Amino acid sequence: MKSQSEFESEMYFIKKKIILTIAFVISLLPMLLNQYGGMKGVQEISGLINLYNPIGIISVLFFIIGVWIPFKNKKINKVFGGLGVVGIVISEIYNFFTWHIMNITGKMSIHNSIEFAFPEFYVGLVISLIMIAVYFCIDKIVKE
């Protein structure tokens, strides 16, 4: 039978995992919006392309592994989860610079990247950056 302190410690970790998972899902919600395109209503591309590329898929898997799969060394969990949240931002930035090359322009251009990104992209990017801060500060946010 577990002691009271072991039970409280276990409940703290479960609470932390649930909060991190909810925050992560919320940080992905802007990807449901149209983030890229030539003109609203004419050519719109969902932010889900950020998750459909290999970086996005691996990042989500790393986050899930880091938060929900217990390792003996807790630093491994922190590294996997951290790679997951940082990887989402990398995926967003990668798509920001490259999505229009095959579809519209045929070349990489910061000007085109800025011109063809809707405000929803920037909102999603800021929320993803906030998620990184939440992930690395969760121990200060959620007290035992």
Regions found by a protein language model. Give the residues of each.
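Juxtamembrane transmembrane-helix termini
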Residues: 33-43, 69-75, 97-104, 134-144
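Interfacial non-cytosolic loop connecting adjacent transmembrane helices
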Residues: 37-52, 93-123
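Membrane-interface helix-boundary signature
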Residues: 9-20, 48-52, 73-80, 114-124
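Hydrophobic transmembrane helix segments
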Residues: 16-60, 95
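Loop-to-transmembrane helix junctions at the membrane interface
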Residues: 66-99
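Hydrophobic alpha-helical transmembrane segments
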Residues: 53-67, 125-130
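Cytosolic juxtamembrane helix and N-cap/initiation of the first transmembrane helix
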Residues: 1-33, 137-144
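Alpha-helical membrane-associated segments of multi-pass integral membrane proteins
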Residues: 16-20, 107-142
